């Protein structure tokens, strides 16, 4: 677990993704929910597409349960950042969800490559109130420790 977490936290996040865990989980939830919502607009979903929607809903449920567990411990600023991050992610899906062009919606549904690996680790950390910094690649032996 520590090795996967170290790798996830060492990777650069996509443009627009929050760096703090609580807002990041809200952003991840909005992205995966938007993708599932888009998939549900398709009239001729393949079994694989239907499975992606199902898995997306499960992942979103996990993110929302983590957000709910962590919410009482968040500052007003963290909650506001989470709301802003979720709104920004939802806004990215809005034009596609409103589109009457099913072929374009289908193509966009197929282009969603998934969430950063950090999303699942951030959800675990906020759910379990883990406040220590995540492990680094050096901590888990993937890199040489920095020279002092």
Each language-model region and where it sits:
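Short amphipathic alpha-helical segments and their helix-coil junctions
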Residues: 1-17, 93-103
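Charged, low-complexity, helix/coiled-coil-prone segments
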Residues: 1-9, 53-64, 142-143
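Short N-proximal segments of mature Sec-exported proteins
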Residues: 14-73
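Compact alpha-helical subdomains of small soluble proteins
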Residues: 59-148
């Amino acid at each position: 677990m520590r090795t996967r977490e170290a790798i996830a936290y060492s990777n650069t996040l996509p443009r627009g993704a929050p760096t703090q865990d609580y807002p990041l989980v809200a952003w991840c939830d909005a992205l995966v929910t938007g993708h599932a919502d888009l998939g549900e607009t398709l009239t001729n979903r393949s079994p694989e597409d239907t499975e992606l929607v199902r898995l997306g809903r499960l992942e979103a449920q996990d993110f929302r349960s983590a957000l709910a567990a962590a919410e009482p411990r968040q500052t007003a600023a963290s909650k506001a950042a989470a709301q802003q991050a979720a709104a920004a992610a939802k806004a990215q899906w809005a034009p596609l969800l409103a589109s009457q062009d099913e072929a374009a919606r289908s193509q966009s549904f197929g282009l969603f490559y998934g969430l950063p690996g950090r999303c699942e680790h951030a959800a675990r950390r906020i759910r379990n109130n883990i406040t220590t910094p995540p492990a680094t690649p050096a901590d888990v032996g993937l890199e040489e420790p920095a020279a002092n």
